[in-house]
Amino acid sequence: MEDLQLVLFILGAIAIVAVLVHGFWSIRRQQPKSLKDSPMGNFYKQQADKESPPKRVDADGFDADGIGAVRVRKVGESNSHETPPISPYLKQDVKAEPKPLFKHTTSTEIKQEPVPQPDFSLQSPLATEQQRGAKVSRQEPVLNGHVPPLGQSHAAMVAQKALEQEKHAQSTTVPTQTALFDEDAYLENTESEDEYVEETVDEGLDEPRDVLVLHVVAKEGQQLNGAELLPCFLTLNFKYGDMNIFHRHVDNAGNGKVLFSIANMLKPGVFDPDNMEQFSTQGVVFFMTLPCYGDALMNFSIMLNSARQLADDIDAVVLDGQRQPWGEFTKQDYLHRIRANA
């Protein structure tokens, strides 16, 4: 038994040594041979020496391209007193160009006499008045002052508030300037100034004469939750603004004139965006004043589509200004009112 163990121990040692030798041999075989050990290294070197013939140099040590042998110099050796050799091929007659002669002239100081300022203004009184008038802020009309009765809705109350703000903005007076010219000179320039004013000043709208109202109300036994209304308002490009309600502007980003608005159907008719999750209502009111900015028919079409889209999103119903189901007869009546106030 001991002899068998000894034999197995010797065979295992021989196997381990064989594996190590084979591993070292495999690693050495996979390593790339250097150019010095390669038998073809000298062959390529000899072929390169045969193909490149020795360059011919002249007596000064320059070849046909004017290049001389490389010279090795010590560090710090001065080259100021040495003149580098010049190739005979580069020795050419170079004519020195004459330096341009400039005649220096003495600059004389130029004194500018002060220009007398006129004692009067060339700006006409009409232009001055228009420029000052442009600075006066004017709030755009949002609602109509004469709101038809809408039952229990608060569109009339919101419209009345907007009308009061509009009258307050229009009551601002603009100071006028005393004319500096005589009356004849003023009348001669009036025609040209009127043309300029028409091009630069936007025409204001007349006072609201009518308001178009649409209701989006919850179905019987249900309510509209603020958590659902707020994302729908934002998706329809409404922006929270004046009077604490949402407005649809000319620009989808919320800039420009107001086209139409949304108010709460219940008192006091406002929204609180910070507490919309706890908010609930029976319905909301879409309203648009006439006349309005832009194309009234297009604006009403956008308002109607927005009301229908909101009703589809929150499972509600679209009603007219009298809280009656929206139909073709009501649509034709609204179109007639739009044409009458266009």
Curated annotation (Swiss-Prot):
Topology Periplasmic: residue spans: 1-6
Biased composition (Basic and acidic residues): 47-57
Record GO biological process: division septum assembly; FtsZ-dependent cytokinesis
Transmembrane segments: 7-27
Xref: InterPro entries: Cell_div_ZipA, ZipA_FtsZ-bd_C, ZipA_FtsZ-bd_C_sf
Residues in compartment: Cytoplasmic: 28-342
Topology in the lipid bilayer: Single-pass type I membrane protein
Stretches the record annotates as Disordered: 33-57
GO cellular component: cell division site; plasma membrane
Localization (cell): Cell inner membrane
Sorted UniProt keywords: Cell cycle, Cell division, Cell inner membrane, Cell membrane, Membrane, Transmembrane, Transmembrane helix
Role noted for this protein: Essential cell division protein that stabilizes the FtsZ protofilaments by cross-linking them and that serves as a cytoplasmic membrane anchor for the Z ring. Also required for the recruitment to the septal ring of downstream cell division proteins.
UniProt similarity note: Belongs to the ZipA family.
Subunit note: Interacts with FtsZ via their C-terminal domains.
HAMAP family: ZipA
Record-given protein name: Cell division protein ZipA
Species this chain originates from: Shewanella putrefaciens (strain CN-32 / ATCC BAA-453)
Gene name of the record: zipA
